[in-house]
Amino acid sequence: MAFSLSENPRLLNCLDSDIPALSTCSNADTFSRMNTMLGNSLDLSGVCTTPTAKCKRDPFNGRPDSDLSAVRSRMLFLSGGQDSSRGLPDVSNWGLGLQSLSLSDWERPWSSHDSDPSAQTNTASLHGILGTPSHLSNRLPSYSEPSIGATDFLERFPGMARLNSQSFLDSHSISPVDSETSGFSSGSDHLSDLLSSLRISPSVPFLMSSMQRDPLKLALGSRLDHSSSPLTPPPSATSSGGLSHRWPGASIWPNWDLMKTPESPFSIEREAWLHRQAASINEATFTWSGQLPPRHYQNPIYSCKVFLGGVPWDITEAGLINTFKCYGPLSVEWPGKDGKHPRCPPKGNMPKGYVYLVFESDKSVRALLQDCTEDLLHPEGYSEYYFKMSSRRMRCKDAQVIPWVISDSNYVSCPSQRLDPRNTVFVGALHGMLNAEALASIMNDLFGGVVYAGIDTDKHKYPIGSGRVTFNNQRSYLKAVSAAFVEIKTPKFTKKVQIDPYLEDAICQSCSREPGPFFCRDKTCFKYYCRSCWHRQHSMDILSNHRPLMRNQKKRDVN
């Protein structure tokens, strides 16, 4: 393919930033004792050794070293099926703090691992086996049985090769009770005291700081359940399943695995929604520069909806209607999220600086344009219209009026050519000045073979920012799909658009039984899938970085 999917380094390198990863200064002596008991086999270079004034007492004074060894064994030998690595860890997840020990598999503490299907059912039985008192059961983390062999374990944790862990691997126990470092029973109160004295989990600001740098994560954060801690994974994050390892690692997104729940029934939908926003964070693989084709209209028919930009900041809906009602009955649509336009701005929020005016007839739009100041842009032949309006605190402000000529929604270069949807691409993030003819000209210059271009519109026949282009050959189609992102530069604007295969209602091409709403655009797949077939196909590591496409569920008028 002509473009590459690269991993966002900001999240993976967050541990190398200037932000203190862990508050381990008060625990330096603890880690030093642990390292001594383990034969100096750990790398403590990432642990702060500066003494702090707040640490007044040593929780380990008076305790024999043998009483601490089993706890250290538990903290180091985490189960490969531990579910806490699924989503965002809880503040009380003490095991996460051991990433400062530079263990190889904890370089990416939130990477996804295959879970043990029996993880949930074994929790209660493990408490019984270990003899944990009931009053401690809600204070200690629960782990599933390790299901990996010694070879796999050492491959995943090469830093543990020197440790005497054979008894742990053979016994399938969390604590190696038969080892030389085991000095007390699993139910001892020393364990509770030791864990309560440690503060080795990263703080909330540290975990959230890297996410606050990314607008996608901020948008996603608003979807979290406000009744729970922002660092608490959703309930389904700890559920088990053989298809839990989905889309980790190589992704153009800033590690969506941090916040999503793989087993959620709508995880694929969230991936598809994120892909629709990909133009904002990806580099263009093709660039087109030039003048847009000139426009010539004779008795144009306008959409009854117009864009009004640069309105006074203190304008009200009543003021807008009072200003424009002389041209005919109208309604006002304020900008909203996800393409929804409420009838009035939300209470407590300032207007966005632009609105949409919806008249009942295109004759009202004609009359409005006649009262506007017209600036003709050469050589495109595109006219800009400005209307002088006032508010209580602003006088004679020029607001831009952007109409839409309905004939600009479609362009056909060869009327006799049969349009094949299999050679059609979807183009998103279009600029408002691009009509169908200009889009066809740009795509033909880049890829060739364009026979049709269309602009998607709403119920008022006003463009919604996307379009379609049909080619007369598969070579041009595949070249456009592989390009994925194209930057368009004109004297008036610069815009990066996104190109994807045009999707239709289709049957799953894997099982041929269920509807296939999910499409994989990677060239190794390039087919429609139902939900179960998508999970089955992309549970393989080699295909796990593929991203789904879905048809936009918003209603639109496809001309």
From Swiss-Prot:
Residues that coordinate or bind Zn(2+) 2: 520, 525, 538, 546
Pfam families per UniProt: CEBP1_N, CEBP_ZZ, RRM_7
Recorded GO CC terms: cytoplasm; neuron projection; nucleus; synapse
SMART domains given in the database record: RRM
Cellular location(s): Cytoplasm
Region (Disordered), start-end ranges: 223-244
Superkingdom of the organism of origin: Eukaryota
GO biological process: cellular response to amino acid stimulus; cellular response to hypoxia; cellular response to insulin stimulus; mRNA processing; negative regulation of cytoplasmic translation; regulation of mRNA 3'-end processing
Transmembrane regions listed in the UniProt entry: none
Keywords: Cytoplasm, Metal-binding, mRNA processing, Repeat, RNA-binding, Translation regulation, Zinc
SUPFAM superfamilies: RNA-binding domain, RBD
Domain RRM: 304-401, 423-504
Molecular function GO terms recorded: metal ion binding; mRNA 3'-UTR AU-rich region binding; mRNA regulatory element binding translation repressor activity; ribosome binding; translation factor activity, RNA binding
InterPro entries listed in its UniProt record: CEBP1_N (IPR032292), CEBP_ZZ (IPR032296), CEBP_ZZ_sf (IPR038446), CPEB (IPR034819), CPEB1_RRM1 (IPR034977), Nucleotide-bd_a/b_plait_sf (IPR012677), RBD_domain_sf (IPR035979), RRM_dom (IPR000504)
Residues the record lists as binding Zn(2+) 1: 508, 511, 530, 533
Assembly description: Interacts with kinesin, dynein, APLP1, APLP2, TENT2/GLD2 and APP. Both phosphorylated and non phosphorylated forms interact with APLP1. Interacts with TENT4B; the interaction is required for TENT4B-mediated translational control.
Function, as annotated: Sequence-specific RNA-binding protein that regulates mRNA cytoplasmic polyadenylation and translation initiation during oocyte maturation and early development. Binds to the cytoplasmic polyadenylation element (CPE), an uridine-rich sequence element (consensus sequence 5'-UUUUUAU-3') within the mRNA 3'-UTR.
Protein family according to the UniProt entry: Belongs to the RRM CPEB family.
Protein name (Swiss-Prot/TrEMBL): Cytoplasmic polyadenylation element-binding protein 1
Organism: Carassius auratus
